């Protein structure tokens, strides 16, 4: 039997506000345990929550970017459950009236473009965390994270492979960091993924029983967890068993999922409207202001890069992976006047060098103006592509040097003396009679071999196009 995997994602996006969603306590990461736990997070008697306006503004931003419906009346609900890191005994969330509904997000997997529908995004507070290490067998409670504002973004179950799920998660991660509503730091828990996975026979309309894998904090773990869980469910069904609805944990060391608890449904949490919070009403004026302040989105910018700078759609997608990358490209392309060549160098040599050194673009020793200067020298014929790579390496090692100084110091000037190049061509032709005969017999590959010999003789300083033209003229 052929099986189909069905995946929906619930992604917790931690909003990068300075204070918490219902109190003025700091959201700064890495403080001493409970340093940022206010009377609200500690649930002391008589304290009341006060809504953080910035949370609503950031939620609207995401809704607009997802081309979603934004509900202008928002009600908060209590999600009741007992856990030590939740002193109130309930989490404030949104059940029936989420701030964002019916959005969509485009993903690219290989050559395929697919739109995933976003069911909803709702505002809620994060819980604290239990600490088990270094307490001699006891468990401590750290409430620093409690009350941190979250947007839980829920997709439709429209992904059919781990690759599609990873592409969706990456697309949302890119979008929330682009909008500057989340820092995207997965290691610190700013972007956490829960994956709902089920399987069904290919062609069956009805969904299988889903299991939810909680708190996946890397794209690699997301892919591994989904693949393992899908295979595990298929094995259960093929052995004649039934998949039980459950909440799962992923063990990255073993690369497998395991049951944490049997899954609860919404009614198990006894949701009801929070009596301490009035409905949040978003005015038409607030909506207009939010629309006016929206930045150019990645898809729009990518289309503009194709139109204005002549780059391919593929390159445009890479260049708009982050706002920093897009800004770097636009600065370098404008300064050099060479959009396509700039894109090639950014997505090629520069990306490879950053990856090798484990560096961010912001820390690159080759700034946008320096890359523009290099690209300009390639465009005007001063540097061949081979010499340009040597110049790039020197620029990386010598961040203060100008391109002119690099060319002078390392002797990278491309040969412009036609007579000198012609003499080299004559010598190579005289010493490679066999290749000459092969070319005259119609073997185009022989021409490349002859050009290669001339480039070797010139130590890479001759212009390959000029060399090729000279050879063809002499052998015509």
From Swiss-Prot:
A Pfam family annotated for this UniProt entry: GatB_Yqey
GO molecular function: asparaginyl-tRNA synthase (glutamine-hydrolyzing) activity; ATP binding; glutaminyl-tRNA synthase (glutamine-hydrolyzing) activity
First-tier enzyme category under EC: ligase
Domain of life, source organism: Bacteria
The protein's Enzyme Commission number: 6.3.5.-
Matches recorded under SUPFAM superfamilies: GatB/YqeY motif, Glutamine synthetase/guanido kinase
The protein's name in its UniProt record: Aspartyl/glutamyl-tRNA(Asn/Gln) amidotransferase subunit B
